Amino acid sequence: VGYDYQARIHGMAEYDGRMYLTDWYNKSVQVFTPSKMEIVFGEETHITSDAVFKYDDIQPLGLLAYGGELLMSVQKSGKIQRYDPETGDLLGVLAEFPGKEIGRMEIARGMLYYIDLKAGKLMKAKGE
């Protein structure tokens, strides 16, 4: 399976039979179907190379399905956003960890764990 698409996929999560992908290059969350990738959040842009590394609150990285919504980490912000996979709406900030760059996230035994890309460490959200 191959696609002619300029995506920079970082995170992915399965929700309700669909695969959601974070694409920081195109500033979007996308849903994967067998025939194509459809944008479900963000803006579809063809960013020139001088804007690729512009970091703002709409460049998603990590993605985790949890409790009927998706949790999404935002590049260089230390924020975990709540995201409604049915509507594409951001539901607000779930947590903020100043000075951290949150990548992949997982839930284990009721606790949120994430990779701090800046420090290169696995972190436990509660009791840090």
Where are each of the predicted segments found?
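A short beta-strand motif characteristic of beta-propeller blades
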Residues: 1-3, 38-55, 89-95
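Beta-rich, blade/repeat-based domains predominating
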Residues: 2-15, 52-67, 97-110
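Solenoidal tandem-repeat scaffolds enriched in leucines and small polar residues
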Residues: 12, 21, 32-35, 41
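Conserved beta-strand positions in repeat-built beta-propeller and related beta-rich domains
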Residues: 21-27, 72-76, 114-120
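Short coil turn/linker residues within repeat-based beta-strand modules
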Residues: 26, 36-37, 47, 77, ...
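Short loop/turn segments that connect beta-strands within beta-propeller blades
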Residues: 33-37, 84-88, 126-128
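Blade-level signature of beta-propeller repeat domains, shared across WD40, Kelch, NHL, RCC1
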Residues: 100-128
